[in-house]
Swiss-Prot record:
Keyword annotations of the record: Calcium, Metal-binding, Secreted, Signal
Cellular component terms per the entry's GO annotation: extracellular region
InterPro entries: EF_Hand_1_Ca_BS
The organism's taxonomic lineage, starting at the top: Eukaryota, Metazoa, Spiralia, Lophotrochozoa, Mollusca
Chain positions recorded as Ca(2+) binding sites: D95, D97, D99, E106
Name of protein: EF-hand calcium-binding domain-containing protein 2
Organism: Lottia gigantea
Residue ranges occupied by any EF-hand domain in the UniProt entry: 82-117
Expressed in which tissues: Component of the acid-soluble organic matrix of calcified layers of the shell (at protein level).
Signal peptide from the UniProt entry: 1-22
Subcellular location: Secreted
GO molecular function, one term: metal ion binding
Length: 119
């Protein structure tokens, strides 16, 4: 019985050793691959770039609608381009206090929280 326990302990130690060795190989391979593609990363980022939150036309419409601090139903439909079904979902998502009016502050808070949760 003691011999069996010793053999099991030895096998477990050997298995752990094999697992760490296999992780080391994977990490080393990952480092080699990263070293090969690292010089090209700035070119890819420069070509694709980080997408802006919106284009100039959207930004102009948004700023005009946000001047009074409240998005009216017509402003929501024209600025965000939602139809009647999307309008109901938009109100349900961005009307935080449930008063039937989407305020700019509510909209920006929900967008910021969503971006933070998305990463």
């Amino acid at each position: 019985m003691k011999v069996a326990v010793v053999l099991i302990v030895v096998l477990v130690v050997m298995m752990i050793g094999q697992e760490t060795d296999s992780w080391r190989i994977r990490i080393r391979r990952g480092r080699k691959i990263f070293r090969k593609i690292r010089p090209y990363i700035p070119f890819v980022i420069g070509a694709v770039g980080k997408r802006q939150a919106g284009d100039a036309e959207f930004q102009a419409k948004y700023n005009a609608a946000a001047e009074d601090g409240v998005f009216t139903d017509e402003e929501i439909k024209s600025v965000f381009g939602v139809d009647d079904n999307g309008f109901v979902e938009f109100k349900a998502t961005y009307d935080v206090d449930g008063d039937g009016v989407v305020q700019v502050e509510e909209y920006e808070t929900v967008v910021e929280l969503t971006e933070n949760l998305a990463g």
